[in-house]
Amino acid sequence: MLPTYFGTSNFLAAFAVWMGVVVLAFAIFCVRRLYFHPYSKYPGPLLGKLTNYYAVYHSWKGDQHIDMWRCHEKYGPYVRYGPNELSINTAAGLKEIYSHGRNFKKSVKYNAMVHQAANTLTTIDKRKHGKKRRLISQAFSDAAFRSYEETIQQKIAQLCTALRRRDDDSNEIVPDGNWGPAKNMSHWCDWFTFDVMCSVIFGVPWSSLTEKTYRNVPHLIEVSNVRVGCLIEAGGSKNMKIDKYLFPAAIAARNQFVKFVNDIIRQGMAMSAKGSLKGAFALLRDATDPETQEPLSFKELCGESATLVVAGTDTTSTALAASIYYLCNHPKVYERAVQEVRSTFQSRAEIGLGPKVNSCTYLRAVIEESMRLSPSAPGPLWRQADAGGATVDGQYIPQGLEAGTCVYAIQHHPEIYPQPFKFVPERWLGPEAVPEQYRSDYSPFAGFTPFSIGPRGCIGKPLAYIELTLTLCHILYAFDMRLPQGVNVNEDAEYQLALHITAAKEGPLVEFRPRTVV
């Protein structure tokens, strides 16, 4: 009940004034963002011009990469996708945003990914990032890669054994020449790449390919990424803390993953005390900055290790599953890749790093085209213009505003990749090998950025190619493979991904027939 001195009419009048002020403020806010903003001249979705929550919504749905591609199809090469975000879908723009020496730094959005300490992926300051990258690169040198090969080969052997099993709960092996039951390759690729990264980084003895103890960890990463992807597009701030009410399952998954990382680091430190620690963790623990002679702190060491596990599991797993998907849906491509591998190697023992693997150029083209159509991180990597602003493909980006290129959109650009939704490995074999209808004035690498480019490009890119090439060589040599009986090949289909920082996926279901090989 209102006090007698505050009558109903006065209350309604005050409420009307208050509402009028709110409406006026909102109108001014909208007018400023739509007509008096440095990005006002650029087309884009209306809600995107007004609020970041347009991007948050599509991040939550997992279709932000598709939506950005559609926006570029509708509006052209320059799209205002957020109030302060300009998406640039040109080969020149890609180079000018991300290459060395550009006046950009990582967006503050990346703060949403920081948990305990900033790592190489999330560090915004260029000088600090340079220090971290110099340290991390010591675990990703050519010599380090050679030392990891034995571990990778062991994991590939375990994967091939798993593909021969009748089912996951028995040791019954499918006889040579017989087709086995369908395998969900999104799961097996996740477990395989997760095992590789944990073994390469920490030298752990267990295997998700043979045991179920840690098989939920890749799923925890996927669930956790839904929340973080939304926080990134919201602007990178976690100060409001409303995410704990919106994403309780994602936070629980994050906490479980952090516990896993802490446990495995403790195992690594225990092995270190015994002098038996191997892998990248040992190299990172002992590494010092060549310029400052400073090592990584313990928190930094934990952060870098966790990031390597996450990035190395998700991205390589998606590329491997996508390659298998496209091979199974394109019989002529499959036959050519099989012929190349089986004519190159006379035994499984010959499949290793060196000239023979490097000579499998068609298989490499299959991998490249698979990553073009279904990139592991298909979204935009936002960059913020530094002091003085920057010019990108003729467009001025004022200081503090952001620009980026959506990986999925640029890798489906019809001028760079004619008939961009067609799976054509020949695009990567040189101009003379490309059928006329798929030829372009651009190099296929002009828009190819599954690992990003420039000083922030993925440091694990060579390791990913090693895993992908060796694994596919072994699978194509040791097995025939096909889609399950009753499932028709579809050469026009694309391996579908959901974007939550990296790509979430399902399938393909594939049947394997072991060959009698040495």
Swiss-Prot record:
It is a single-pass membrane protein. It is found in: Membrane. The keyword Cell inner membrane does not apply. Glycans are attached at residue 184. Heme binds at residue 458. Belongs to the cytochrome P450 family. Keywords: Glycoprotein, Heme, Iron, Membrane, Metal-binding, Monooxygenase, Oxidoreductase, Transmembrane, Transmembrane helix. Pathway: Secondary metabolite biosynthesis. CDD domains: CYP67-like (cd11061). One of its GO terms (biological process) is secondary metabolite biosynthetic process. Gene3D superfamilies: Cytochrome P450. The chain crosses the membrane at residues 11-31. GO terms for cellular component: membrane. GO terms for molecular function: heme binding; iron ion binding; monooxygenase activity; oxidoreductase activity, acting on paired donors, with incorporation or reduction of molecular oxygen. Its EC number is 1.-.-.-. Its cofactor is heme. Cytochrome P450 monooxygenase; part of the gene cluster that mediates the biosynthesis of aspercryptins, linear lipopeptides built from six amino acids including 2 highly unusual and nonproteogenic amino acids, 2-amino-octanoic acid (2aoa) and 2-amino-dodecanol (2adol). The core structure of aspercryptins is as follows: Ser/Ala-Thr-Ile/Val-2aoa-Asn-2adol. The first step of aspercryptin biosynthesis is the generation of the fatty acid precursors, octanoic and dodecanoic acids, by the FAS subunits atnF and atnM. Induction: Expression is positively regulated by the aspercryptin cluser-specific transcription factor atnN. This is Cytochrome P450 monooxygenase atnE. Disruption phenotype: Abolishes the production of aspercryptin. InterPro entries: Cyt_P450, Cyt_P450_CS, Cyt_P450_E_grp-I, Cyt_P450_sf, Cytochrome_P450_monoxygenase. The keyword Oxidoreductase applies. Pfam families: p450.
